[in-house]
């Protein structure tokens, strides 16, 4: 899918291109493009982490009568919360880059997106350990 920007340049919004890092030598110039690339990396890294946690919960609670349902609900709520936060923080990062007049390399979008997931993991574990 391609969207046309205000300066009549084409913005590439292909999920396959973002995830395969095809865009060697290109830069992300528009706010939409920066937000989309950062958000997709945050989305898929969060999906990977929550998928692994869900499988672990499902295996550990398989003999529990309501364990499967509880694990699905917990993983779903955690994933939706992290994706909502990723939308907001991706827009903030892209906005800062845009206001500063900087272009973003595709690898920077990867670092920002996966970095959001890593920070979410660190904050989540520190909050859990504080309650024990």
Swiss-Prot record:
Keywords: Cell membrane, Glycoprotein, Membrane, Transmembrane, Transmembrane helix. The chain crosses the membrane at residues 38-58, 69-89, 105-125. Residues 59-68, 126-132 are cytoplasmic. Residues 1-37, 90-104 are extracellular. One of its GO terms (biological process) is negative regulation of canonical Wnt signaling pathway. It is a multi-pass membrane protein. Interacts with CTNNB1. This is Transmembrane protein 170B. The gene is Tmem170b.
């Amino acid at each position: 899918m391609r969207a046309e920007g205000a300066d009549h340049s084409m913005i590439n919004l292909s999920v396959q291109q973002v995830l395969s890092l095809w865009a060697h030598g290109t830069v992300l110039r528009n706010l939409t493009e920066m937000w989309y690339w950062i958000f997709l990396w945050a989305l898929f890294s969060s999906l990977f982490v929550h998928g692994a946690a869900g499988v672990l919960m499902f295996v550990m609670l398989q003999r529990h009568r309501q364990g499967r349902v509880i694990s699905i609900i917990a993983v779903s709520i955690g994933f939706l919360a992290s994706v909502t936060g990723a939308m907001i923080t991706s827009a903030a990062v892209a906005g800062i880059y845009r206001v500063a007049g900087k272009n973003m390399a595709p690898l920077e979008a990867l670092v920002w997106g996966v970095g959001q997931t890593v920070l979410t993991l660190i904050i989540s574990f520190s909050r859990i350990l504080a309650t024990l």
